[in-house]
Amino acid sequence: FYFGATADNANDLASLKGLEGCCGIKLFAGSSTGNLLVAEEDDIDKVFQNSSKVVAVHSEDEAILNANKKLIKDGDVHSHPVWRSSECAISSTRRIARIAERHNKKAHILHITTKEEIDFLSQHKGNITFEITPQHLTIYAPDCYDKLGTYAQMNPPLRDKSHYDRLWYGVRNNINDTIGSDHAPHLKVNKEKSYPNSPSGMPGVQTLMPVMLNH
């Protein structure tokens, strides 16, 4: 399991080195499901400085998320990738790579979604690893939102085919390090709420293997 990083516990992370069952530190650079968030660069820097394990990062830029909230359209899940833009993702990923390299620490970028991240991370493979999810390799906008509505809502979001194609380029050229599930199921009654009150995420653990084998 991951240990959740916060601004308040950043100074204590070195003590986790021998913690049994802890595979790494989880850092939310952008707000998602739940209330874990380390958004400020000084706090992110402190997490990496004190971490004795790999830091796995939900990589979205909180400042851009907040600035883009005005782009959310009530009842229209198509606005989800407009709010949580590709700029939001690559801005955060560049910052995480810079901080990890500064401290010579290992970072794992979770569930990347953009062509910009594929191109950037292909040039920063040292201590930086990253994953792609089956859902981002299977469906893309706008069709996914047309057909599935809020069932296709996740963070970071499903994007258009240009991003989908570049993610597959990464897989075919062995640029990504792993396939990750980003397992985040919700009750049907909640997923069917009107956007943006619907929660982000979908199941992944039980579907990762058959979906990827089918590809």
PLM regions and their residue ranges:
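Histidine/acidic-residue-rich, glycine-tolerant segments that coordinate divalent metal ions
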Residues: 1-99, 116, 137-140
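Short catalytic-loop micro-motif centered on adjacent basic/acidic residues
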Residues: 1-2, 106-111
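Electropositive phosphate-/nucleotide-binding environments in soluble metabolic enzymes
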Residues: 10, 38-41, 86-94, 111, ...
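Glycine-enriched alpha-helix->loop->beta-strand junction motifs that scaffold or abut catalytic
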Residues: 18-25, 51-54, 101-103, 124-129, ...
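Divalent metal-coordination and catalytic microenvironments
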Residues: 25, 58, 107, 131, ...
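Active-site loop ensemble at the mouth of alpha/beta enzyme cores that anchors a bound cofactor
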Residues: 72-76, 126-130, 134-173, 185-208
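His/Asp/Glu-enriched, well-ordered alpha-helical/loop segment
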Residues: 77-104, 173-179, 184-215
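Binuclear metal-ion centers of metallo-dependent hydrolases, dominated by the metallo-beta-lactamase
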Residues: 110-120, 124
